[in-house]
Amino acid sequence: MKLPIFIADAFTATAFRGNPAAVCLLERTLEEDAHQQIAREMNLSETAFIRKLQPTDSFTQSSRFGLRWFTPVSEVPLCGHATLASAAVLFHKIQNRNSTLTFVTMSGELKARRAEDGIVLDFPVYPTFPQDFHEVEDLIKAAIGDTLVQDIRYSTDTRKLLVRLSDSYDRSFLESLKVNTEPLPAIEKTGKVRGLILTVKGEPGGQTAPYDFYSRYFAPWVGIAEDPVTGSAHTVLSSYWSQQLRKKEMRAFQCSRRGGELDISLRPDGRVDIKGGAVIVLEGTLTA
């Protein structure tokens, strides 16, 4: 087995920042177990597998492909940064000629289109609903202790818990906050929660670039203690902060150690455009 494989840093214009994803190009069907084995070997938060939908398709000419995403421990239904990385590989390395690519996925058809300063992902928007604090109190206290919480929401579509911290906290507080993810899967084992979003309101600017909101994302339930930059989490965050800020156009920053920027535009058709950059940092051949 020889497979072309790449690593791209997504949601960044600079190498070694953003969120790295492995991207594997499949000329033919791969044995089912091999997807997980390769993802475990790559040991990144996600490995993406792009496959041809028809034997006559071409990675350089076709505009529709199948796409799946695997963490080191399981397949996931949606991954934004690995979709961005996949589009970057096809556009910039494979020299695909199309302006828009369509990926057939577990979350339906997702589109990625070229932009002057990045790649725009066309994703669904997932609403959030008020969550009773007492139902998730043990989970939140285990993760962030006595940190003040302003709002708690739950996304039934994505099984993500969104915790908005007090507006008295700023970016530096969120960045330095020690989050204990190790006990979370044992505390929440019903399957209701598969990801934890922590978020704070942004600031008007000053000496730093203005962002509408900041976030961090944790998914120990699928083997990811903290994800550097998470496109799928922003399908939830965009819905929440659009309502809170009464804005359709927003700029977001995910406050992981690597950090990443996302430009968000909510559309009239109930979907969201998420724009980001990507830098390909490695290309090679998987020979196992």
UniProtKB/Swiss-Prot annotation:
Q: Which GO terms describe its molecular function?
A: isomerase activity
Cite a single GO BP annotation: biosynthetic process
* Gene3D superfamilies listed in its UniProt record: Diaminopimelate Epimerase, Chain A, domain 1 (3.10.310.10)
Give the enzyme's main class according to its UniProt record, as a single word: isomerase
What does the record give as EC number? 5.1.-.-
- What InterPro entries does UniProt report for this protein, alphabetically? Phenazine_PhzF-like (IPR003719)
What Pfam families has UniProt attached to this entry?
PhzC-PhzF (PF02567)
Active-site residues, record numbering mapped to chain: E46
Q: Which keywords describe this protein according to UniProt?
A: Isomerase
What's the family? Answer: Belongs to the PhzF family.
Protein name as it appears in the record: Phenazine biosynthesis-like domain-containing protein 1
- State the organism of origin: Mus musculus (Mouse)
